[in-house]
Amino acid sequence: MLEILWIALAYVLGSAPWGLVIARTFCGIDPRESGSRNTGATNVARLCGFGWGVATLLCDVLKGAVPVWLAFRINASPVFVSMVALACVLGHVFSCFMKFRGGKAVATSIGIFLPLAFWQLLASSLLCMLVIWRSGFVSLGSLTLVTALPVALAVSGQWGWLPLSLAVWAVVVWKHRENIVRLRSGTEKSWLKSKNKGAAAGNAAEGDDTQNMNPQDAGRKDG
């Protein structure tokens, strides 16, 4: 009975829309209506700034990590712990606080594996960050992470968590289906391109201001 209640509680905790709470409370923005219309850390970072994106990421990771860590202490059975972990992920994807809509579950998926397969998760996360750094696509990095994790678990002999990692892979890939289409068509948003466009726009604006100045003002600016 305790196990069933804990699975239900894990779903409710996973449903907590921290991205929506943070963006609305501190930025006055509804992330469901702006940017990529997603409550995840990436969209919150785009709309509210890097710091609030990190805060969202941490909250979404913790709402996966804490219930799973406690579940492991209640009953270390891989079946029970996996059900609790999957409940956290499904809560994020189908939030009971947002009419059963939600995010893409990458951060919460990271959270559930923190207490279960730390080193395998670390290796997959480093590969994820490398892909994001090289390509500029957060979505591609996220897909790399959930694809690499089952491989890392299998290679290291952690068979108990392999079914969970495959279920998480299926959920995350399904939630990224539109991103996959955009990646294939070359229309996916890139962090690198966004930064370059912002820098170019700033340089263009500065150039326009200089052209509009009289010679004396331009001289003072150069000095």
Swiss-Prot record:
Superkingdom per UniProt: Bacteria
GO cellular component terms, semicolon-separated: plasma membrane
Species for this entry: Desulfovibrio desulfuricans (strain ATCC 27774 / DSM 6949 / MB)
Enzyme Commission code(s) on record: 2.3.1.275
Transmembrane spans: 2-22, 52-72, 78-98, 112-132, 153-173
Single GO molecular function: acyl-phosphate glycerol-3-phosphate acyltransferase activity
Gene label: plsY
UniProt keyword list: Cell inner membrane, Cell membrane, Lipid biosynthesis, Lipid metabolism, Membrane, Phospholipid biosynthesis, Phospholipid metabolism, Transferase, Transmembrane, Transmembrane helix
Listed name of the protein: Glycerol-3-phosphate acyltransferase
Lineage: Bacteria, Pseudomonadati, Thermodesulfobacteriota, Desulfovibrionia, Desulfovibrionales
Function as written in the Swiss-Prot or TrEMBL entry: Catalyzes the transfer of an acyl group from acyl-phosphate (acyl-PO(4)) to glycerol-3-phosphate (G3P) to form lysophosphatidic acid (LPA). This enzyme utilizes acyl-phosphate as fatty acyl donor, but not acyl-CoA or acyl-ACP.
GO biological process, one term: phospholipid biosynthetic process
SMART domains named among the record's database cross-references: G3P_acyltransf
UniProt-annotated stretches for the region Disordered: 191-223
Subunit and partners: Probably interacts with PlsX.
Localization annotation: Cell inner membrane
Keyword Kinase on entry: no
Membrane-topology descriptor: Multi-pass membrane protein
Assigned protein family: Belongs to the PlsY family.
Annotated pathway: Lipid metabolism; phospholipid metabolism
